[in-house]
Amino acid sequence: MWGRWRGAGGRRGVAQPVIPQMKLLGGRVPLGASALGLLIVCWFYIFPGGERLPGHKEMIRQVLQFGPRWGRNRSSGDSFRKLLQDCCDPPRLFSMTKANTALGENLWYDGEFFQSLTIDNTTRSLFPQDTPIKLPLKRCSVVGNGGILKNSRCGEQIDEADFVMRCNLPPLSREYTDDVGTKTQLVTVNPSIIDKRFQNLLWSRKSFVESVSVYKQSYVYMPAFSTKRGTDPSLRVYYTLEDFGTNQTVLFANPNFLRNVGKFWKSKGVHSKRLSTGLFMVSAALSLCEEVTIYGFWPFQMDLGGRHISHHYYDNMLPLSGVHAMPEEFLQLWHLHKSGVLQMQLDQCKKDVSSKKPH
């Protein structure tokens, strides 16, 4: 399944080919190197990098030009759902279950090469028999954490959905509820959050339980089997919530689902080390839900009115560079919006009646 790289060095006693040389700017450059350079140029022409993507001003122009008109295209939605079903089978593979994971199975991590885990009785006992999410879902809200949500007054509209997905333990305190709502059926948690904010639950179990209580009776969705270092923190989350008798249920992301979703979007032109959590959730929602509206998916520093906005609605902490391809992801989602597959909320849901927001 996993290929291995072979060394390029020649064997002793075997004559090595002479690489032809060509003159360039007074020096000599291997012909192979020039061919490689041409290949790289062609690659960036065919698969342009971020510098060739539309900037925020161009995207604002496109969004404003498209206007508020939007209609759900059920035919396009059904076709896209079939694509996701064929590649990734989200209803069956979205989370780890006893039904999709055999005892003794060698489970390959999706975020690391050559790393796997053998599923034993202890690990398998943490999985539900089948997915506990009752399918199909009718209306879903997927809430990203983009700064465009600030002062959007979209909270009420978000909460009207039957199923609300949120990403990476976002704050839902009173100062934000007008904009992002409070309802949550599923919230994702990256193991890195458990490490940075809760010291891997070695000393901060109670503070973690208090933090997730805001999500009430929801599913806590964790990529426990994406990297080896993320497995133990994810299992600690499971045991912590179980020990405290909370209302949350931990679901572990199936690495086969995450891997296949990554391949799917790569085939569509998203070239990144790893997809954002938001795009994983949108992909799941488009398969599990009949109607999908997404909020807070805007990777630019200005809103539609040309005003500077923070990276998140709650802070301005920037992500690590080189991991995600947020503009490329946005363009894919914008195309789905224009096609009527999903609705992307980019403007205020309710217009402000005063300069000061009521609370």
Swiss-Prot record:
<dbReference type="GO" id="GO:0009311">
    <property type="term" value="P:oligosaccharide metabolic process"/>
</dbReference>
<keyword id="KW-0443">Lipid metabolism</keyword>
<dbReference type="InterPro" id="IPR012163">
    <property type="entry name" value="Sialyl_trans"/>
</dbReference>
<comment type="pathway">
    <text>Protein modification; protein glycosylation.</text>
</comment>
<protein>
    <recommendedName>
        <fullName>Alpha-N-acetylneuraminide alpha-2,8-sialyltransferase</fullName>
        <ecNumber>2.4.3.8</ecNumber>
    </recommendedName>
</protein>
<dbReference type="GO" id="GO:0001574">
    <property type="term" value="P:ganglioside biosynthetic process"/>
</dbReference>
<dbReference type="GO" id="GO:0006688">
    <property type="term" value="P:glycosphingolipid biosynthetic process"/>
</dbReference>
<keyword id="KW-0812">Transmembrane</keyword>
<keyword id="KW-1015">Disulfide bond</keyword>
<keyword id="KW-0217">Developmental protein</keyword>
<dbReference type="GO" id="GO:0003828">
    <property type="term" value="F:alpha-N-acetylneuraminate alpha-2,8-sialyltransferase activity"/>
</dbReference>
<comment type="pathway">
    <text>Lipid metabolism; sphingolipid metabolism.</text>
</comment>
<feature type="disulfide bond">
    <location>
        <begin position="140"/>
        <end position="289"/>
    </location>
</feature>
<feature type="binding site">
    <location>
        <position position="278"/>
    </location>
    <ligand>
        <name>CMP-N-acetyl-beta-neuraminate</name>
    </ligand>
</feature>
<comment type="function">
    <text>Catalyzes the addition of sialic acid in alpha 2,8-linkage to the sialic acid moiety of the ganglioside GM3 to form ganglioside GD3; gangliosides are a subfamily of complex glycosphingolipds that contain one or more residues of sialic acid. Glycosphingolipids are required for convergence extension movements during early development. Can catalyze the addition of a second alpha-2,8- sialic acid to GD3 to form GT3. Can use GM1b, GD1a and GT1b as acceptor substrates to synthesize GD1c, GT1a and GQ1b respectively.</text>
</comment>
<feature type="disulfide bond">
    <location>
        <begin position="154"/>
        <end position="349"/>
    </location>
</feature>
<dbReference type="GO" id="GO:0005783">
    <property type="term" value="C:endoplasmic reticulum"/>
</dbReference>
<dbReference type="GO" id="GO:0006486">
    <property type="term" value="P:protein glycosylation"/>
</dbReference>
<keyword id="KW-0333">Golgi apparatus</keyword>
<feature type="topological domain" description="Cytoplasmic">
    <location>
        <begin position="1"/>
        <end position="28"/>
    </location>
</feature>
<keyword id="KW-0444">Lipid biosynthesis</keyword>
<feature type="binding site">
    <location>
        <position position="168"/>
    </location>
    <ligand>
        <name>CMP-N-acetyl-beta-neuraminate</name>
    </ligand>
</feature>
<keyword id="KW-0735">Signal-anchor</keyword>
<feature type="glycosylation site" description="N-linked (GlcNAc...) asparagine">
    <location>
        <position position="73"/>
    </location>
</feature>
<keyword id="KW-0472">Membrane</keyword>
<dbReference type="GO" id="GO:0005794">
    <property type="term" value="C:Golgi apparatus"/>
</dbReference>
<feature type="binding site">
    <location>
        <position position="312"/>
    </location>
    <ligand>
        <name>CMP-N-acetyl-beta-neuraminate</name>
    </ligand>
</feature>
<keyword id="KW-0746">Sphingolipid metabolism</keyword>
<keyword id="KW-0328">Glycosyltransferase</keyword>
<feature type="binding site">
    <location>
        <position position="145"/>
    </location>
    <ligand>
        <name>CMP-N-acetyl-beta-neuraminate</name>
    </ligand>
</feature>
<comment type="similarity">
    <text>Belongs to the glycosyltransferase 29 family.</text>
</comment>
<dbReference type="GO" id="GO:0006491">
    <property type="term" value="P:N-glycan processing"/>
</dbReference>
<feature type="active site" description="Proton donor/acceptor">
    <location>
        <position position="324"/>
    </location>
</feature>
<feature type="transmembrane region" description="Helical; Signal-anchor for type II membrane protein">
    <location>
        <begin position="29"/>
        <end position="49"/>
    </location>
</feature>
<feature type="glycosylation site" description="N-linked (GlcNAc...) asparagine">
    <location>
        <position position="121"/>
    </location>
</feature>
<dbReference type="InterPro" id="IPR001675">
    <property type="entry name" value="Glyco_trans_29"/>
</dbReference>
<dbReference type="InterPro" id="IPR050943">
    <property type="entry name" value="Glycosyltr_29_Sialyltrsf"/>
</dbReference>
<dbReference type="GO" id="GO:0000139">
    <property type="term" value="C:Golgi membrane"/>
</dbReference>
<keyword id="KW-0325">Glycoprotein</keyword>
<keyword id="KW-0808">Transferase</keyword>
<dbReference type="InterPro" id="IPR038578">
    <property type="entry name" value="GT29-like_sf"/>
</dbReference>
<feature type="binding site">
    <location>
        <position position="276"/>
    </location>
    <ligand>
        <name>CMP-N-acetyl-beta-neuraminate</name>
    </ligand>
</feature>
